[in-house]
Amino acid sequence: MINKISGTEIRALAKHICMSPHKARRVIDQIRGCSYEQTLMILELMPYRVCYPVFKLVYSAAANASHNMGLNEADSFISKAEVHGGAMMKKFKPKARGRSYPIKRPTCHITIVLKERKKSPLVV
C-alpha cells in the first residue's frame, strides 16, 4: 500500500488487488462520503469479498492520519474513493485433446482519501 499526505488530505493506495474493478466499485460507492467509524461498520457487515482489502486500506489511511498528521480518526471522513482497472493476469488452463483455454484475472487499484471534518465554531 502506498500512502501519501498532502495538506489535510490523507491518501492510501492499494495496487494489484485480484478483483474485478466493477465488483470493487459496488462497495466503494457505498462508503464514499461516510465517516470513518460508519465506514468500518458498513465494511464489516457487507458480505462481499472486496470488503476486506478496502477495510484494510481505510484502516491504514486512518492510522497514517493519526500517526503522521496527529489527526483524530473520529473526525475524519472518506472524501474521495476511486477504483481503477489494473493489469490483466493471463493464464492458460489445459483442456481436452491437448488444447488450452485462456483465463483472464482482472486486477484493480483502489484509492482512498480521508479528510478531517471542519468543526463549526459555536455561536453564543
UniProtKB/Swiss-Prot annotation:
It is found in: Plastid, Chloroplast. CDD domains: Ribosomal_L22 (cd00336). GO terms for cellular component: chloroplast; large ribosomal subunit. The keyword Ribonucleoprotein applies. One of its GO terms (molecular function) is rRNA binding. One of its GO terms (biological process) is translation. The keyword Transport does not apply. Its main location: plastid. Keywords: Chloroplast, Plastid, Ribonucleoprotein, Ribosomal protein, RNA-binding, rRNA-binding. InterPro entries: Ribosomal_uL22 (IPR001063), Ribosomal_uL22_bac/chlpt-type (IPR005727), Ribosomal_uL22_bac/org-type (IPR047867), Ribosomal_uL22_sf (IPR036394). Part of the 50S ribosomal subunit. This protein binds specifically to 23S rRNA. The globular domain of the protein is located near the polypeptide exit tunnel on the outside of the subunit, while an extended beta-hairpin is found that lines the wall of the exit tunnel in the center of the 70S ribosome. Belongs to the universal ribosomal protein uL22 family. HAMAP family: Ribosomal_uL22_B (MF_01331_B). This is Large ribosomal subunit protein uL22c. It comes from Amborella trichopoda. The gene is rpl22.
